[in-house]
């Protein structure tokens, strides 16, 4: 009689083996989605607080312009920081 959980043993059939590559890809996708959601949430919070003085049923023209400009600046800043961070990571990895 085989032991409990023998489908995941090192030897034997590949039917029960875990595909770690596929799992890693799924985790990477989930992390990317979570990061994008967090970026969007932070940007929305900051721009709302900056641009909306008195919340109402709709945005006036100046509020719309303020939000658009705020979001553009936020994304530009995030992209600049992201590029600098990735560049630094690459330099650090090259030193290893």
From Swiss-Prot:
Belongs to the small Tim family. It comes from the Eukaryota. A motif (Twin CX3C motif) lies at residues 47-70. GO terms for molecular function: metal ion binding. This is Mitochondrial import inner membrane translocase subunit Tim13-A. SUPFAM superfamilies: Tim10-like. One of its GO terms (cellular component) is mitochondrial inner membrane. The keyword Lyase does not apply. Disulfide bonds join 47-70, 51-66. Pfam families: zf-Tim10_DDP. Coiled coil: none annotated. Heterohexamer; composed of 3 copies of TIMM8 (TIMM8A or TIMM8B) and 3 copies of TIMM13, named soluble 70 kDa complex. Associates with the TIM22 complex, whose core is composed of TIMM22.
């Amino acid at each position: 009689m085989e032991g409990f959980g023998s489908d995941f043993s090192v030897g034997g059939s590949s039917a029960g083996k875990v595909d770690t590559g596929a799992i890693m890809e799924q985790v990477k996708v989930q992390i990317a989605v979570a990061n994008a959601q967090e970026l969007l949430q932070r940007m929305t919070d900051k721009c709302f607080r900056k641009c909306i003085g008195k919340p109402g049923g709709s945005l006036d023209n100046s509020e719309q312009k303020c939000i658009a400009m705020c979001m553009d600046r936020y994304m530009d800043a995030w992209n600049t920081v992201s590029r600098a961070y990735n560049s630094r990571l690459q330099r650090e990895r090259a030193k290893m």
